[in-house]
């Protein structure tokens, strides 16, 4: 996504300052618009996900108080909405089998907890799985319904969703937790898929002690605003 800011606003000054003073390896993506264009975006009718279509373009709005962490992105205040323009997702093609392609988003698109609370969970019962796929509360330990507010419905059109294959995920046991296989359209890579001979076939290195550029990805500006650290940080796997 690209952040959209009003020309001459404090948000423009803030994001320019971040772009100048933050980690030089991270390119902050923003677009400055005039007052007429910004008013159209600001006054649009946003749904429960915070999304709206304005003149054929999809936008997401977010306030600082709705972010999971505020330590990294420099919010001028916590109650003013910021606006993010959706962009086509850039994919890494990990493998192709016939007419099926295994895809990984090239950049972290959002920032979410693996589970909403500190409960001992596995992939099958985590809230991140429900949020990614739009499952109801019966599928996670928090009983939280994600059938309306989720990732898959926001990131993909109905036509695109029909093209995504539901795959059986062979989940590795984690410590003392026995994992069942799951059937999901969207999922996190497993440990085996990022560190093993299989990972090498996907283009990743197999030695975590050696810097591997393929394991590196820069978060989108929206994920940054939600709380993602854009310097050195790790990510969760499904296992």
Predicted features along the sequence, with ranges:
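Collagenous Gly-X-Y triple-helix signature in extracellular proteins
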Residues: 1-239
């Amino acid at each position: 996504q690209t952040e959209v800011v009003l020309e001459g606003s404090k948000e423009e000054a803030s994001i320019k300052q971040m772009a100048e003073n933050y980690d030089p390896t991270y390119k902050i993506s923003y677009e400055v618009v005039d007052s007429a264009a910004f008013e159209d975006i600001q006054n649009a009718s946003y749904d429960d996900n915070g999304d709206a279509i304005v003149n054929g373009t999809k936008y997401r709005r977010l306030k600082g108080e709705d972010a999971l962490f505020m330590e990294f992105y420099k919010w001028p205040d916590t109650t003013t909405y910021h606006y993010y323009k959706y962009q086509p997702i850039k994919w890494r093609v990990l493998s192709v089998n016939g007419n099926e392609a295994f895809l990984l988003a090239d950049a972290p698109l959002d920032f979410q907890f693996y589970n909403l609370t500190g409960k001992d969970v596995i992939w099958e019962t985590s809230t991140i799985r429900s949020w990614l796929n739009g499952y109801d509360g019966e599928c996670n330990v928090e009983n939280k319904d994600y059938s309306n507010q989720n990732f898959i419905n926001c990131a993909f059109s109905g036509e695109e969703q029909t093209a995504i294959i539901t795959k059986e995920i062979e989940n590795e046991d984690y410590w003392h937790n026995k994992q069942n296989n799951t059937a999901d359209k969207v999922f996190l890579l497993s440990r085996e898929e990022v560190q093993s001979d299989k990972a090498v076939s996907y283009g990743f290195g197999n030695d975590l002690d050696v810097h591997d550029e393929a394991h590196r990805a820069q978060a989108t500006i929206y994920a940054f605003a939600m709380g993602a650290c854009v310097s050195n940080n790790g990510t969760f796997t499904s296992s």
